[in-house]
Every structure is written in structure tokens, then in C-alpha cells.
Amino acid sequence: MPVSDFQPVIGLEVHAQLLTQSKIFCGCSTAFGAEPNRNTCPVCLGMPGVLPVLNQRVAEFAVRTGLALECTIRPTSVWSRKNYFYPDLPKGYQITQFDQPICEHGRLVIDTPQGEKAIRILRIHMEEDAGKSVHDAGGGQSLVDLNRAGVPLLEIVSQPDLRDADEAVEYLKAMRDVLVYLGVNDGNLEEGSFRCDANVSVMPKGSTTFGQRCELKNLNSFRFLKQAIEYEIARQVDVIESGGKVVQETRLWDVNKGVTRSMRSKEEAHDYRYFPEPDLPPLHVSAEAIDAAAKALPELPRAKLQRFTSQYGLPAYDARILTAERPLADYFEACAGHYKDYKKLSNWFLGELMRLLKEEGTPLSALRFTPAQLGELLGAVDQGMVSANAGKDVLGEMFRTGKAPADIIAEKGLAQVSDTGAIEAVVDDILAKNAGEIEKYRAGKKQVFGFFVGQVMRAMKGKGNPALVNELLKKKLGD
Amino acid sequence: MQLTDLTMLELAAKLAAGEVSSEEATRASLTRIQQVDPKVRAFLRVDEAGALAAARASDVRRKSGSPASTLDGVPLGLKDIFLTEGVETTAGSRILEGFVPPYDATVVRLLKEAGLPLVGKLNMDEFAMGSSNESSAFFPSHNPWDVSRTPGGSSGGSAAAVAAREVFGALGTDTGGSIRQPAALTNTVGLKPTYGRVSRFGVIAFASSLDQPGPMTRTVADAAALLQVIARPDAQDATSADAPVPDYSADLEAGVRGLKLGVPREYFTEGMDPEVEAAVREALREYERLGATLVDVSLPHTKYALATYYLIAPAEASSNLARYDGVRFGLRAKDARSLRDVYALTREQGFGAEVKRRIMLGTFALSSGYYDAHYLRAQKVRTLIREDFTRAFQQVDALVSPTSPVPAFKLGEKVEDPLSMYLMDIYTLPCNLAGLPGLSVPCGFTKAGLPVGLQILGRPFDEAGLLRIARAYEREHDFFRRSAPL
Amino acid sequence: MALTLEQVRHVATLARLSLTPEEEQRFTTQLSAVLDAVEQLQSLDVEAVEPTSHATLTSSRLREDVTRPSLPPEKSLANAPAKSDTSFAVPKIIE
Ligand SMILES: [Zn+2]
């Protein structure tokens, strides 16, 4: 059977680092990039005698995420120990949640070529991250850095509802947008603060029994996720086609070779011996706390996108870009309060503003001008007080100095000349000096018109209202 | 009478009156250790410099009229399970030999803040697993009342040191009887508080849902005073209780008239030493004379407590002891060349037989295919045991029983028979499973001169009630005045 | 229940204990005896009983999300059997 006769079945496990100041069970900083073991204390080093105390923001973030993903929140969730030995796991067990996680039974809607599709969320639980081992340290040694040990994570497990690599990518993007919108995660795949494993299996089309699945790891970009899943589907189909059986195992995406390869671990079969963590009482979340979190929930990316198309009449393309990040969407809405041609406003956002932000590397939060000032500038352009081109310069100046647009226009003398008399005088002067060109024009060489416009604009230092210049030139040239 | 014969509160009174200095008391304690510890072997380590420095600081406070607490200046010993910043802490194990903690346990901090000089670290069964002190990786401690016998365990060193008057008091921990049983075997008072009453932060874990630190002293009033220092909620222990801390000495002398004391049928069983039973029965009659009513009660699931305990405690221990892996602190096997060796050889060489036995048992009880029938079932039976107590406390104010079925036994007698050793805890461990407070108070001696202890169990957070009941008996029988024949 | 030698070896592997042959034998006997003794729990009907995993039913004590000073690395690593700069060192991990 060709690949097209097989149905892939995919589920994703997302690990999202929560944006807390301190670790999940101790006061050490979660900051990235410190010298090894700089952010460690007896608790996260797993020293004798230490006890974990839950960072309450971790629970808040978990509830917020659960609500955004339409989960049921457990009034009482239970911590468990997952026991295994590894040098970057200081206590010899990971504190996580097992049979009673904080959130269950949610969904996330994604777009597919066939339309909207709801991917079911099986569960969300809180847990601590492990440290980092550097294996190729030389001298036959591996080195252990426990700065990451105890950083709070949410694990979000989907049902195996995804049917191809594109859906998986779409799901992961949508998930990232939601988490970033909620302010619980920075969405950074490269640094690993947002990461995912994929469970992939294939079954003959029409079958209802899932095939044996493999877990794919090391998928630290959307591209790798797509490539790895596509490779893995083809590999599993090959195995089955050649009469073999897919073995349940963990496989690593090899970026360089573009293949998934088995992690032939010499480790004995795992037996994590989960049991309830005696050092942490069960976590109680009150109905009031859940209600309050639900009320405080921000509008989510998908809802916002739909509202931007309906409320502002924007094309889906514009709305998608404007709502990709919450601060940009918020800023657009603030500006929309001061300028009512939303499509034109969107053009300025998608063009000039985003170019400036990107070039200067400025975060939106550091913008020095107000939405009212941007509205004022666009109004001035509409009214012909300043040309569209000069308007871009004004915006650049506002961006750098935070000065009011009117002041910049005045200071730089960018005000557009819309006085017909003044323009007419310049036009007359230019025509008088270029009798030969007028001849050519009248003889049919219409492109000379551009020459006249250029001459007039140069004489006016670019400040002539282009519409008026055009109009007067045409009149004088007898068109 | 020597200075070291004073109780904690007697010494505190003399310190307050300026009749004696903390430095003198601490030196007396250190001298006594030099004299008798070669026979008792209670101490793993003596911190002479640290104790004397703390004593002098206390004397300065006393002189300036601003003592840090009523016990300011009273020298104390610590079971080697409490982490002490800068002072080696081993839990009686080779695997932690040379481990110098970078922080103090919460209770150690509280003791320091209250001004008590800490004279040293006391011997214990390795990781508190044992009832005789013989599983200590270093040496067994001896019972001051008969040095051929055990002082009990796991806080055997602490009990022996207090009984031998090497220290005025000590802290121990109790997971299945480790404070009360050695107290009973050494003619001392041992109090295991309600689970959560005293912080476990900085206390090396054996079984997290059962462990509880508590005072080990010569008298009931000393136990009340010491508990007053260490009982409080701790932001670093999520299982520590917010319940208000009462004044433990307020009702100490209130007597037992009108109280109902339950006598659990299941705690007077075959296998109990007749002399122990006789001493305890006599104590019960004393309570009747003092105006208490004895009530026959039943705790029907008592017979399951031992099995329940020996599944839950080893299971938690197997996980708690996974951190001793030779990576970040403690022993690493010298001949370990691979990561696998670092783990397996270090743990093989660093742990003693009893610890390995319990790690094996606990790992098995949690392992795939056996969890439901072993660990989970034990947790359910634990509920039944708790409910037994809840029902009993609807009828009575406290329960009274022997602490240990037998007096101190010979060192070496039970080492090769783990099950008979485990039976030493049958009257003490149900209390831990239920999280209740329990106390052992001296109630006489056998003909051979071996101490017998009376156990009193109470409602959650009713330490004050237990102390009051124990004190009523102690007022009539001051066995604590007798000194061991050293 | 009686444990087999194989089971004892498997459990020792899970627990990362490199037991000697004598220990394997001794633990097989001793653990079997303990497991026999705990067998009595099987006779109880606990179908409808909730398990107790925590001795007291305290509500969870939480902490604010504020950072507190970490240990300086020299203290974090003071007890390390082997280290390299401020990292713990172990024999090379083979994956
Ligand atoms: Zn930390």
C-alpha cells in the first residue's frame, strides 16, 4: 500500500516553562544564562532535609491556561513523585502530577484546509524541570548544571486527534499563541522554554485501531516538527510495508541527517514508581478562585482575530498579523480610538510601524508616542497638511524622539504647500525655463510630464501637494 | 549533686538567678561527656567550640538582663538527623560521612535563636531505620542503665545522652516510635508531637508522611518547655500546621481528676514482658487514685499497623534516599568508573544492611504490578487505623498503654532477625500512621533495674493534654531523680 | 509471598544497589518473610476506603513568587565528590 493508504495519528505533548520570577518549589531565580549552578539552593540541589513549597503563581498560571483551553479544573489536585535516577535530577525523583492533574478535558480549535477543527486536550499538569547535563565536556566527564532544576513547567497533553504534520504545526502554533497571550510562557522554541514531543503512529485508512506509536523528541522548531513527523510517517509505513512491526520507542530527530533515530537506551526498562508526594499536601483551588481567573481571562488570539475582521472590517491577512501578539493588537485598538479609517491605520501598522519596530529592535512597550499622536499624524496626511512620504519621516522622528507630530512638521518644515497661488508661481517659473521640453510634450512625448513634476517638487523642496502640482501642470500644459 | 543532675528548668532558674553561668553548665556537660561517653557512646561528634561560644553569648545576654528565652543557656544535644550549618551531619550513615550542611534545620535555627548551646550530634540508627541504634554505621550506643543493652532506637543516642546526664535535653525524631521507645528504655521523657506541629525542614527524611521531631528530656516540664521553643508553623514546610501554639506549661499541674483515659485492649497482648505489664497496670491504678476514669476501648485495626507501616515507611524511604547518589554530596565509590557505578557502587558501599533492606522493600512495594496490592492497600488500611483513633477519642481524652512491649534488650540480640526487631514498635507506630501526638513517661523499673515507659496518646494538637496527664503521674513518682549506674 | 532471586535482582537494579551474591540471597529470604507478614492486609475489605497519603489534612501552604538569594556556587558545590569549575562532574553519560 502507498503512504496515501495509511492514516497517521498524532498527539503532542507540550512543555511550557512558566514565566515566574522564582522556581516552582524554592526562591531561586528562573533567569536564563547564568553561570552553572549560580541559581541553586539546598532545595533545588536536592540536599538532605529540604522540602518543597509551591510557588502560588504556578498554580494561578495553570488554572488560567486550563480555562483558556476550556478544561475542567480539579478542585483538589495531587502531587506525585516520578522516581528515576539521572544526574540532572537532584532528588532522584521529579515532583509532578500523575493521576489527579490540575486540568483535564479541554480543547483547542485550529484551522485546517477542511475548516475549523477542535483538538481535544487530555490533561494539563504542573511539574518541575530537570537540570542540564553537558555530555561532551572532555576528560571522560559529563558536567551537571542545576540552574534549570526546579523551573516550573506546564505539560499539556493532546488527544491523538491530529492527522498530519500540518495539523500538528497548526496546533503547536495556536497553542503557543494562546500561552503567550495568557502571559504564562514566552513561546521560545529555540531556547527550549516552549517545547514539544510528538507521538506518531499510522494505521490503514478506515481502520479504527491505532498502530504502535513512537515518541519523537528534539523538535525545537516548527519546521523540525513538520519534517520529523513526515519522516516518521514514511518510516513507519516502510516498516509495515516490508512486513515488519513498528516498535514502541523514543526516537530523536537528527537535525543534520533529517531522520529520526532510535534512542537505544541501555537503561533498564523504566518503572517510575509514581506515588503521592508526601511533602506536599494536595492543592485546593476554590470555585471562587476559578471564577475570578475566568473573569480575568484575556480575549484569546482566535476570538480577537475574528473580532478584528468583523469590528474593524479588516482583511483576514491584516487581522492575523495585528493579532499575532497581544501588545500589537492592544496598541492597534488604542490607535483605532483616535483614527477611524481602520484599513489605512492597518496599512501604517503593517508597513511603517512594524518596519521601525523591527529595524530599531524596540519593543512595543517602549514606544515613545501615544496612540492619539499617531491618529493626529494620519489625520494630517489625510488633510494634505503633510505628504504621505513626509508623514513616514514624521513617524520615524516620533519613534525616535517622542515629539508631537505637529512640532516635528513645524521644526523640519515638512508642512506641505497646498496654497494654489504659491504652487502656480513655481509652475509658471519652471515652464518658462523649459520651453523646449514643453514642445516635446506637446509633440506627444507624454513622459516629459514626470520631468515637470520633478522640477516643481525639487524647487519646492518636496513640500508641494502632489495632487495640486499635477492638477496645475496639466492645466498649464493645456491638457 | 552535680550541675549535670539538674533538669533543664532547674538549670534555667539558676541561670536566671545568676547562680551559675551557661559556660559553667556547658563545661559541666562537656566534662560529663568525657567521663561517661566512652561507655555510653551516645555522641558521634562533640562541638565544644561552638557550644562554648554559644554559652558565652548566652551569659552576656543573661548579664544584660535580656535572655533570648527562658531556656537561654541550657546546653542541648541533637540527634544527627538535624542539619547544622558548618557541622558535619550524617544521619548515622557512611554515605553522608563528611557532609557539612550549608544550612540549619528550622528547629536548629529556633534553638539557636532561643539561646541554647548545642553541644554535639548524637548517634542514631542509620537514617533512623532501627529500634536499637545498632544500624548506626559507626557504632552502637549503650544503655546507661546496663551498658550491655541497647538504649533503643532510632533516637538511641539522644535518649542515652539524656539518661547519662551528658546533656540536659535533646531533640530526636519519631517515625514509628523512635523518640518514645528509646525514652521508655532509658527512664526519660520522649514526646512525639502531632504530625505538622514541628517543622521537618532540615531534618533528614526517613518517611516523610510519618517523621516528626520532638523533645527528649528528663522531665515532663522540660519536654513542655522545649516543645514551646520548636513548635510553630514554618513557611519552608508545606506540611507544617497553622494550628495555634498554646502555652504548654499553663495546665501542666492541673491533674487528671475527671479525665477519661482509654486503655486499648489491643495494646496489652501476648509477648509483652510481664514486668512491663505489671508496671503499666500499676500506673493505670495510680491514675484511678488520682481521679481519672479508665475506659476499656478497642482499636480493632491495630494488628494491621505493623504491616501497614512496613509498606508505607520503606516506600517513602526508597524515594527519599534516592538523592544519595554520589553526584552532589556525600560518598562516591572510589572504584566507580561509569555513571552506573557511581550510583550502584556508591549506594552499595554507603548504605548499611537495614537501609538496603528497606530500600528494597519500598522499591518493591511501589513497583509496577505490586503497587495496588501493597502500597495503595497499605494507605487504605492507614485510613482504617486513623478512624479507629477518631472513634476512640469520641469516648476518651487520651489513651494509655505500654510504650515498648519489652525493656531494653541485649545488643546483638535481634540484629539478625529483622521481623522480631520490627515488633519492638507495635505500640508506637499506629500513632505515627494516624499523625497523632504521643508521649512516653518513666513508670518504674524491672527487678533487673531496667526502665519501663508508659505511653500516652492524644487527639491531634493536644500535646498540652498529654503533658498534663504525664505530669500528674510524674508528680507522684519522680523516677527521673534516679541516676543510671555508670 | 515469596520473592524470586530474579525479582530481587530487578528491584536492586531499580534501586541502583549493586548487591553482592550473598546479599541477594539474604534479601530474598528476608524480604519474602516480611512480605509474608504483610500478606495479612489482603484479608481486609478496603474496596470503599479512601487511601491516606498525608497524616493530617492541612491545606497547602504556598509561597509568593518572589526570588530569594541562592547559595553561592562554592557553597552549592562544597560537598561535591567531583566538580569542574562550578559544575558537578560525573563519568561521561552515554546515551
Ligand atoms: Zn533553589
Curated annotation (Swiss-Prot), chain C:
Catalytic activity reported: L-glutamyl-tRNA(Gln) + L-glutamine + ATP + H2O = L-glutaminyl-tRNA(Gln) + L-glutamate + ADP + phosphate + H(+); L-aspartyl-tRNA(Asn) + L-glutamine + ATP + H2O = L-asparaginyl-tRNA(Asn) + L-glutamate + ADP + phosphate + 2 H(+)
Pfam families found in the cross-reference section: GatC
Keywords in alphabetical order: ATP-binding, Ligase, Nucleotide-binding, Protein biosynthesis
Renumbered residue ranges of the record's region Disordered: 51-95
A GO term, aspect molecular function: glutaminyl-tRNA synthase (glutamine-hydrolyzing) activity
Assigned protein family: Belongs to the GatC family.
HAMAP family documented for this protein: GatC (MF_00122)
Name the UniProt record assigns to this protein: Aspartyl/glutamyl-tRNA(Asn/Gln) amidotransferase subunit C
Source species of the chain: Myxococcus xanthus (strain DK1622)
